[in-house]
Amino acid sequence: MQDTHISLAHGNGGRYMRELIEELFARHLANDRLDIKVDAASLSLESRDVIFTTDGFTVQPLEFPGGDIGSLAVHGTTNDLAVAGAVPKYLSLNAFIEEGLEIAQLERIISSLASAARDAGVKVVAGDTKVLRRGEGGGLYLATTGIGFKDPGMNLGLDRIQDGDMLLVSGSVGDHGISVLLAREQFGLRGDLKSDSANVLPLTLSLIH
């Protein structure tokens, strides 16, 4: 792409939007289930119990120590499926991009999202982009929907908690929230904490296998 910043033209359905989708999003997210020429994905559900979830991400700043809004969107969605006893399989992605966002930053974030999706074993199979007028968004908002298949051996859920159960956490409590807070540089705080945003599926699988 020759443009350096997002303009309203990237959201009007014409050539600029096509270039944005083909040369940035599709280049990083390409897979055998993603067809950018249609507005829906055809999926095989394999006659298994399906679990799905949806989430939105508006974190500021968009990039922070240990992660960014792209990897966070994947981890947040796939982890919701994992802790519900599902193995994540597919994602949809909606990107609400503010006019003026640097395309280089957008590409870093989408590349990070694609890498996180590959690591989690999921495919982005459908998506949409919208461009917001300058001042109407925080640079980039992402919305995702995730689909996973319930693992027969993963009977997880809040309703199964009993007295005497052990509480398992995946790391130090609060690392992600504090790292984002430090990156905002609003309160004169300093530190070297990094976000611990990560895929927890290996952890949930280890509980029952």
What label would you give each PLM region?
Residues 1-208:
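Helix-biased detector of long, well-ordered alpha-helical tracts
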